[in-house]
Amino acid sequence: MALDQEVKAAIIAKYGKKDGDTGSSEVQIALLSEQIKILTEHLKVFKKDHSSRLGLLKMVGKRKRLLAYLKRTDYARFTDIVNSLGIRAK
């Protein structure tokens, strides 16, 4: 259920500020969003996989905290990432 290396590299290239930028908030949010999509599809098939459900909830919480940080520090970047990923955010 982990991201493929090619998918991860494509996300980093799209949302990173420079080559190899894996630590910026936008990249972290985009990577978490992709993992959340994959895990959501997994849980639609395997409804009783409670350990994966717990991991999903942790990822959603982490993404929520990163979005709150980005909203607090740079609102323009926050709106860009939310619109490009199609995330509902308050």
Curated annotation (Swiss-Prot):
UniProt keyword Zinc-finger, yes or no: no
Keywords attached to this entry: Ribonucleoprotein, Ribosomal protein, RNA-binding, rRNA-binding
Superkingdom to which the source organism belongs: Bacteria
GO biological process, one term: translation
GO MF entries: rRNA binding; structural constituent of ribosome
SMART domains (UniProt xref): Ribosomal_S15
Assigned protein family: Belongs to the universal ribosomal protein uS15 family.
Assembly behavior: Part of the 30S ribosomal subunit. Forms a bridge to the 50S subunit in the 70S ribosome, contacting the 23S rRNA.
Stated name of the protein: Small ribosomal subunit protein uS15
Species this protein is from: Aliarcobacter butzleri (strain RM4018)
